[in-house]
């Protein structure tokens, strides 16, 4: 009877991890060997694990990553110029602490999006908020936001997310609203939150794609300063796997 009351109380307090742990442990024959502090400590730890897992699930759902990539699963055998030491550096929290940008360039199919998603997955596991957006969808969203009056709110949301991933940026020349929006996003995040950008276009061509020289200078100065520049090469991994 007391156990049922305890379980009801734990659920009423929304301590669902503790409730499940309590149920599981009292069903184990050796649970009687645990002291009260030991038993309580174990179910408290299980509650923390439950909440951590729930938060991770929510972070990954909100991140909208298109593929479940992991840094641990990166294939270094494929000849694409990927530096293992650089990935090891990105496997620490240092680049988050210093708000460093990661710029991934290379032809289609060499794993830019996979690596970007792996960084997003890594960030979520550390407890950071993440958002993945393809560049065309980003600019479409901002255009709609201007029409419905939520433009500033959308920019603020993009500024606050702790890791923003912009995939397939600079595929086509930017128009005036697009480059101004991009400048606002990069400026808001500079020295505040890290950003990951992927592009098929080499960095040396970004200036001309942005268009306006003054805006291009401002954007590239912030992107290139103190950032990781990873240029992938070689044939498409998708082709070699066929």
Where are these regions (language model features)?
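Charged, alpha-helix-enriched surfaces in structured cytosolic catalytic cores
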Residues: 1, 5, 13, 17, ...
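Intrinsically disordered, low-complexity and often Lys/Arg-enriched segments
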Residues: 1-8, 240-242
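Short hinge/gating elements
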Residues: 8, 24-28, 102-105, 205-206
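Interdomain "pre-motor" coupling segment immediately N-terminal to P-loop NTPase/helicase cores
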Residues: 11, 16-67
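Generic structural signal for secondary-structure transition and capping sites
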Residues: 15-18, 48-49, 95, 163, ...
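Clamp-loader machinery-focused feature within the broader ASCE/P-loop NTPase space
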Residues: 50, 55-91, 97
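Conserved P-loop
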Residues: 82-160
